[in-house]
Amino acid sequence: MLIAVSTNIIFIVVNTICVILGKYSVQNKKNESYSIANINLAELLASMSLGHIISSATVLGLKSLNLIQ
């Protein structure tokens, strides 16, 4: 069974928002090695983890309301 395009779009949008918010809210000064866009690994992992949790809850909620398939 293929995943619907709407599910993929929700995951991409929510994860992008979480990474942007995590860049400014998570401040880990112990690890100073920065990757792309001046965000370190701890900030990236925390943001992506939260993004996946919020995305999963959003998709399940929208599917239970029959707004997406």
Curated annotation (Swiss-Prot):
It is a multi-pass membrane protein. It comes from the Eukaryota. One of its GO terms (cellular component) is photosystem I. It is found in: Plastid, Chloroplast thylakoid membrane. Gene3D superfamilies: Photosystem I PsaK, reaction centre (1.20.860.20). The chain crosses the membrane at residues 1-21, 42-62. It holds the Pfam family PSI_PSAK. Although originally identified as Cyanidium caldarium, these sequences derive from Galdieria sulphuraria. This is Photosystem I reaction center subunit PsaK.
